[in-house]
């Protein structure tokens, strides 16, 4: 859990903004959303496999687009 020390002359809004940024960098919200509900191992594997297929398709489309330009 990220922590932020509030300085003496620092307004609360600035400290809150720093805390939110620290939470975003640490991935607290994404992790909590991911762990909100139990995910079966088969669902996790299926999700990971789908992400891999999507990455591969994206990479292939980039390569095709790169080779078809003729200017």
UniProtKB/Swiss-Prot annotation:
GO molecular function: structural constituent of ribosome
GO biological process, alphabetically ordered: translation
PROSITE patterns in alphabetical order: RIBOSOMAL_S21
InterPro entries: Ribosomal_bS21 (IPR001911), Ribosomal_bS21_CS (IPR018278), Ribosomal_bS21_sf (IPR038380)
Taxonomic superkingdom: Bacteria
Keyword Hydrolase part of the UniProt annotation: no
GO (cellular component) term, any one: ribonucleoprotein complex
Short name of any one Pfam family annotated for the protein: Ribosomal_S21
Sequence similarity: Belongs to the bacterial ribosomal protein bS21 family.
Protein name: Small ribosomal subunit protein bS21
Organism this protein belongs to: Hydrogenovibrio crunogenus (strain DSM 25203 / XCL-2)
């Amino acid at each position: 859990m990220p922590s932020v020390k509030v300085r003496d002359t620092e307004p609360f809004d600035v400290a809150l903004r720093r805390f939110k940024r620290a939470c975003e960098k640490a991935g607290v919200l994404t992790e909590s959303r991911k762990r909100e509900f139990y995910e079966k191992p088969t669902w996790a594997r299926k999700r990971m496999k789908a992400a891999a297929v999507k990455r591969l398709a994206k990479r292939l489309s980039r390569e095709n687009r790169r080779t078809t330009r003729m200017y």
